[in-house]
Regions:
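N-terminal intrinsically disordered/low-complexity leader segments
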Residues: 1-8, 193-197
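Helix-turn-helix
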Residues: 12, 16-59
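Hydrophobic alpha-helical connector segments
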Residues: 73-104, 155-158
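All-alpha amphipathic helical-bundle segments outside canonical DNA-binding/catalytic cores
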Residues: 84, 124-125, 143-159, 173-176
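Hydrophobic alpha-helical segments that form the core
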Residues: 109, 148-168, 180, 184-188
Length: 197
């Protein structure tokens, strides 16, 4: 069992992997670059991740997903109106994308694109992350009076729109797509739950 220093080294590698995956994907990130950027000792990678880069990816996906979830939760709780709450989440994501000079996308999507066809463990970690975020959106809509089925479907549509907006934003180097998603959320979610669903 690693001591405090070992846990700190492992945590640095996981966090660094999340940043690198976000900017350059799983395939574009090498172990040596990870060690160099994290400042981890050369022999420490396989000590902490005997399953190799895939094991690291599972840990980095979980870590990144939890960090993003915390930001989502803060925004969802900051507004009484669900449309304003979800719009604020999208605004936060757009600001983060712009701050990264459109180099940083969703770390979970980046890893999914690179690994889904070849690693069930990494794919499962990515799916869990997306399902968690969808669950946060769904729970917020449920608190606003949406039925379970309607909230679940709307949360899935919102998540898909956000992920698509990030991709379009990186390609166009602007936040127009995400701004459109935020506007749509604000205008269609509103404070009233849908009549059917």
């Amino acid at each position: 069992m690693p001591g405090d220093k070992g846990r700190a080294t492992r945590a640095r590698m996981v966090q660094t992997a999340g940043v690198l995956f976000r900017r350059q994907g799983y395939d574009g990130t090498g172990v040596q670059e990870l060690l160099d950027r994290s400042g981890a000792p050369r022999g420490s990678f396989y000590f902490h991740f005997p399953g190799g880069k895939q094991e690291l990816a599972v840990a980095a996906v979980a870590d990144s997903a939890m960090g993003i979830a915390k930001g989502i939760e803060v925004m969802l709780e900051a507004h009484d109106d669900p449309g304003q709450a979800v719009g604020a989440v999208v605004d936060l994501i757009a600001a983060d994308l712009e701050r990264s000079d459109f180099r940083g996308g969703c770390p979970i999507a980046a890893v999914t694109h690179d690994t889904a066809a070849r690693s069930d463990e990494v794919r499962a970690a990515c799916r869990t992350a997306f399902e968690h975020w969808q669950g946060l959106l769904e729970a917020r809509l449920r608190r606003a009076g949406w039925s379970l089925a309607a909230a679940r479907q709307e949360a899935l549509v919102i998540l898909a729109a956000i992920e698509g907006g990030i991709t379009l934003g990186r390609a166009a180097r602007d936040t127009e797509a995400l701004a459109a998603v935020a506007r749509r959320c604000r205008s269609t979610l509103g404070s009233a739950a849908p009549a059917v669903g």
